[in-house]
Regions:
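Structured helix-beta-strand junction loops
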Residues: 33-34, 69-70, 91
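Short, well-structured N-terminal submotif of metal-dependent ribonuclease cores
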Residues: 1-39, 52-65
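Short, solvent-exposed loop/turn segments at secondary-structure junctions
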Residues: 9, 44, 82
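Short secondary-structure boundary segments
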Residues: 41-42, 79
C-alpha cells in the first residue's frame, strides 16, 4: 500500500507546476497497475486548509473526485495517532506535527 501525501494530490489537480505531469503519471500508473493507495483525513484537511482561504474549493473537490475515482482508502486520524506522533517526534526530529501524524497513521 502506498500513502499519498497532500502535495502529490495538489500537483495532480492544481495549477501549472513542474511536478504536475509527474503526479498525474503516478496516478495513471497506479490505476493501470492496480496499486493500492491510501491517504488520511488529515490530508483532506490539509487540502481544504490550502484551497478554502483562496477561494479554490473546486480544486479541493477535484482532489476528492480523484481520491474517489482511484478508490484511494482514506484513513481516519485517531487520537492514538496524535499520541503516537508525539512519541515519534524524538526519533524523527526533522518531521513536523502533520507529517508525524501521517507516519503514525501509516504505522497503525
Amino acid at each position: 500500500m502506498i500513502f499519498v501525501d497532500t502535495n502529490v494530490l495538489m500537483y495532480a489537480v492544481g495549477r501549472s507546476h513542474p511536478l504536475k505531469a509527474r503526479a498525474r503519471a503516478f496516478f495513471e500508473q497506479a490505476l493501470n497497475e492496480g496499486w493500492r493507495l491510501c491517504t488520511s483525513a488529515e490530508v483532506l484537511q490539509e487540502l481544504l486548509h490550502a484551497y478554502l482561504p483562496v477561494g479554490r474549493v473546486t480544486t479541493f473537490e477535484d482532489a476528492v473526485r480523484l481520491i474517489e475515482r482511484l478508490d484511494i482508502e482514506v484513513w481516519p486520524l485517531e487520537a492514538g495517532d496524535a499520541l503516537a506522533a508525539a512519541s515519534l517526534a524524538t526519533q524523527h526530529p526533522a518531521l513536523g506535527a502533520r507529517d508525524l501524524c501521517h507516519l503514525a497513521s501509516c504505522r497503525r
